[in-house]
Regions:
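HIT superfamily nucleotide-processing domains
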Residues: 1-83
């Protein structure tokens, strides 16, 4: 369920299990993900005020899906710690 007024996921098509599996060979995918995030946050009008990018890595980091993905949250003030 959404954690903020704006909450979307960015998921690479190529399978990368987690951030632990980012390599020199696939790092271009990560660069593309951040280009996509920049484009979408700008289109949604949240880039100026700010947003949060979340990636959970490993069991203790809260990762429940074995495919790298990023949550992007914005549209309100985001507190810390998140939970």
């Amino acid at each position: 369920s959404p954690e903020a007024p704006v909450h979307f996921l960015v998921i690479p098509k190529e399978h990368i299990k987690s951030a632990n599996y980012i390599t020199k060979e696939n790092s271009h995918i990560i660069a593309h993900i951040f280009e996509v995030i920049n484009k979408i946050t700008s289109e949604l009008g949240i880039s100026e005020d700010g947003y949060r990018i979340i990636n959970n890595c490993g069991k203790l980091g809260g990762q429940t899906v074995d495919h790298l993905h990023f949550h992007v949250l914005g549209g309100r003030e985001l507190k810390w710690p998140p939970g």
